[in-house]
Amino acid sequence: MIKQCSIHGLLTSMLLIVFSLMSNDVIAQKAIRGTVLDEANEPIIGASVLVKGTTNGSITGVDGTFNVKANPSDVLVISYVGYATVEQQVGNQTQLVIHLREDSKVLNDVVVIGYGSTTKKELTGSVTSMKKDDLNPGTFTNAMGMLQGKVAGLQIINPNGADPTAKYEVLLRGTNTLSAGQGPLIIIDGVAGADIRNINFQEVESIDVLKDGSAAAIYGTRGTNGVIIVTTKRARSGKTEVSYDGQLTVGVVSRRAKPLSASEYKSVIKEYRPELESYIFDSDTDWFKEITQTPFSHKHNLSISGGSEKFSHHTSFNYEKSDGLQKHNSSEKLMARTNIRQSLLDKWVDLDYNLNIIHRKYSPSSTSAFMQAFTHNPTEPVYDDSDPDAGGYSRIKAMEYYNPVAIINERNMESKNDNYGANIRATLNILPIKGLKWENFVSYDKEQYETREYYTHYYPSLIGTNGQAYIENYQENDTQYESTLNYSNIFGKHSIQALLGYTYQYTYSTSASMTNSGFDFDDNQTHNIGTGTNLTEGKASMSSNKEDNTYIGFFGRFMYNYDDKYLLSASLRRDGSSRFGDNNKWGWFPAVSVGWRINKEKFLSNVKWIDDLKLRAGYGVTGNQDFSNYKSLMMMTTAGKFYYNGQWINTYQPASNANPDLKWEKKAEFNVGVDMTMFDNRLSFTFDYYKRTTSNLLYDYIVPTPPYVYNTLFTNVGKVTNEGVELTISGTPFNTRDFTWNTSLTVSHNKNKLVKFTNDEFTNGTYKVGWSTSAACYTQRLIEGQSLGTFYGPIWLGTDTDGKDVLLGQNADGSVPEEQWEKIGCAYPDATLSWSNTFRYKKFDLSFSLRASIGGEILNNYAMEYENLSSIGLRNISSNWLSQTNFTSTTYKYSSKYIEDASYLKLDNVTFGYTWDFTSKMIKRLRLSLTAQNIFCITGYSGVDPEVALSGLEPGMESLSYYPRTTEFTFGVNIVF
C-alpha cells in the first residue's frame, strides 16, 4: 500500500498548482454596462460576460445587467447554459443590449460519439446524450445512479439495497451473453474500461450512451453491451470561481422481510406445533434491530476553476463518508482531480491534462447476517454469560444457525483501495490545412487494494478454530495510448468528417493472499498472521498470481452530410487481443448508418410546427471479449511429488483444455429510428426499433476424453437474440419568465430468445440453472427457442383439505417428475417506463422521477421457505404466514405457487430547492435543497422487493440474504463564490 504521506504530498502538490494558476484580473480602460436578454426580452440571470482572451469578466445580476472594464478593441464573450454563445465587439459603446438565443433544445447540441463528436441533427446512430441538469438529482455512492430511469432501454438496478459498498447492475437492451461480461464499456474522460466508482457524481458534466451497433462498432470487441461515455467537468476560461457542494443524508428502512414477533411466535407454536414448545425461551428479541443502525452519510465537494483562453483549470476535492444500514458496514472516500487546458504556439497545439487521486476505505457487509436475523428465534436472548466458549453470546448448536449479533461483532473486515490516474491529450491543429488535426492521448492508471479479514475465537461458524485471519493484496497497472487523425470541412452543400486511429492498451496485475488459523489471542488480528498454528501444521494456505493482457485496435470512420438533408456514417475497426486463441487473434467490425432529414424536403417546407424530422437506419457488428485471461491456453497445475536424487520434486499436469479457436462473442445489430422536434423545440420524440443477434456465445461445453484432456471446454457455440422498441418523449409544456415545466417519458420493450445453445460437436448436460436453496432444485432452464431467465416447474392447483399443495400431474407421493415440468414464468419484464419532471417557479424548483416495470416474474424464496409451519421451531417464519387461510400445512414444494408478478411502480426521487443570486463580490449564488429518494413502491408482489438482479443466468430470484433498501432524506447546499 502507498503510505498516507504520499497521498498527502500529492494533494499538497495539486493545491500548489491550483493556487499558482489564479491570475489577477486584467485592468481595462473603460467601464462597460449592459443587459443580457433572451428572445422574449426577459433578463437572463447568471450569464457569463468575459473579455475574450483574458480572465476579466462579470456575471449578470437579477435584472440581467452587468458591468465590466474593457478596451474599445476588446471582444466580449457572453454565454449561458442552454443558450448559444455570442461575441460582441466593444467599440465606442458604453451601454450594450445583448440577446441570447435558446440553444439547449436546438439541433446543434454536441453529442459525444466514439473518438469524436457530432451534432444532434447529424446523428445517425442510436445515442442518448444527458447533460448535468438532465440527470437524477440527489446523492449517490456511485455516479451510475444518476442515469437510473433516464435512458430508454438502459436498466440500472441496485439489488443490494442500502449497502454503501455495493455496485449497480447495468443492462442495455437485454442480456447478450451466457458467461461473458454483461455491463457496458465505461469510458471516463477518454480512458476506456474505467471504474465509474472512481469519480464523484457531483463532477459529472455529461453522459452519452451509445446504444446500437452502428454507434458502438467503433469500439470493436468491447462494444457489444453498449458504451457509456462520461465527461467530467472541464477547465473553462473566465474569472476564478470557487464552488462548494455539501450533502447530509439520513435513511430509514422502507421495506423488509418481517418475521413473527416473540408473542406471535409463542402463540403459533402453542396452537399449531405444541410439540415444539421446548424452543420457547423467555426473551423478546428484535434481531433485525440488534444488527442495524440509522444510516447516515455526508458528502463534501470543493471545486476551483478559472483561467484564460490560453490557460485554464478546474480542480475539485471530494470527501464522502457513508454508513450502511447494517452495523459495521461503511464506505469512506477521498478524491481529488484536476483538469488543465493549455493552448500553445498561437493555437497550433492544445493540451488537456487530467490527474486523479482516489483513496477508498470500506467495511463490507455480512452476506448472511440479515438472513440469520430473519430466521432467528425471537424468544432467544442475544447474550448468555454461561457460555464463555461462545464469547458470552447465546448459542444453540444447530446446522447453519448462528447468532447474527455475533456474526457482525466478531468479524473485522476492512478494505483499502487507492487509485492514481494521469492522462494527457495533445492536439496538433495543422492550420495550413483547414479542419485537420492530429490527437495523441496517453493515460496511466494504477489501482491497488488490500483486504484484511479477521474472525475471532467467538465467530459463530468458526468456534474451535481459535481465530482465522485472511489478507489479500492486489495491484493493477493500465496503460493506454491512442492516436487519431481527424479531418472535417465544408464544401458548399457538402460536409465531411474523416477519422483514422490506432489504440493500444496493456494491463498488468499481481495478487497474493494468505489464510491462517489457530491464534493464542485476538488482539493482533491480521497483523501477526504467521503465529497461527495452522501454518506449523501445514494447514494454512497462500497463493499468488500475475496476469497481463494486450489489446490493439485500428479504426476509421467517414461521415458525410449533404445539404443538412442526407446523412451517412460508415466505420471499420480491426481488433486484436491476447485473450483470443492463436487461430482467431484478429477480427473485423464494420458499421454503416444513414439519415434523412425529411423536414428539409420541399414538401414539408411550409409545415412550420415541425422543427426537425429525421429518419435513420443503421447496422453494426461488435464483439465481447470480457472474459478471463488465458482461457485459450492449456494451464498447468501441480500434480504431486516424486522422490529423486535425495529430494522430493513437484510434478505438473494440465489444468484445462487449450482452445486455439477461442474468439470474441459477435453481435450484429440492425436499428431504425425516428427523431422529431416540434413547436419551436418544445416537444421532442425519439423512437427506435432494434434487433440484435449475438452469436459465438461462450460457455463451458462437454467434450469427449480423449482427444481432450478434460471433459469441459470453454468455447464459442450459442446464439441469442434481443428485439425491442424504445420511445422517448420530452417536452416543455410551459416556459415563461416565472414558470417552466420540463418533462420526459421513456418506454422500453425487449424480447429475449436463446436461438442456439448446442450443436453436433459441443453439447452440455447442465442446461439447468437458477439454483434455489429453498427449493433444493434448479428453477430455470436453458432451452432453445425460449428466453433466458425462464422458470420451469410444476403447476400449482391449490391445496387439499389437509392443507397440502396439489400439483398438476403429481404422483402418489405428491411429486412431479422434472421431465413434466412446464414453463411457469420469465424473469425479464415486458416493459419498463420512467417519467421525470422538473418545475421552476421564479427561484423555486421541484422535480420528481417515477419508474415502473411491467410484467416479468420473480421467485419468492421467502414465501417458499418461511411461509409454512415446516420451518418453525428453532427457526422463525414470515409474518405473512398469519394472513394465510390454511394454517395446518407443514410441507412445501417448489411450484408456480411461488412465482409471482414482478410489476412495480416506484417514486425514485423528489427534490425541492431554492436559489439565491447575489451581486456581492464574495458570493454569487446560494442554493438549498431537500431530496427524498426511494420513497415508495407500489406492487402486488408479496415478498420484500420486486426489483431484484436481472443479469447473469439466474435472474429474477429474491435472495434470502437480501439487504433492505432505505428511504433517504438529503439536505443539500451549493455555494458559488
Residue ranges, per PLM feature:
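Surface-exposed loop/turn segments flanking beta-strands in extracellular/periplasmic regions
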Residues: 262-283, 370-406, 453-469, 510-541, ...
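Extracytoplasmic gating/loop element in the C-terminal half of outer-membrane beta-barrel translocons
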Residues: 405, 536, 577, 851-935, ...
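Outer-membrane beta-barrel transmembrane domain signature of Gram-negative proteins
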Residues: 276-305, 456, 462-565, 619, ...
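Outer-membrane beta-barrel transmembrane strand signature
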Residues: 279-320, 388-431, 533-557, 561, ...
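Conserved small-residue
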Residues: 243-280, 513-515, 715, 732-827, ...
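Flexible loop and strand-edge segments within Gram-negative outer membrane beta-barrel domains
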Residues: 253-255, 280-281, 285, 291, ...
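Short, small/polar-rich motifs associated with maturation and membrane association
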Residues: 2-345, 349-352, 356-358, 421, ...
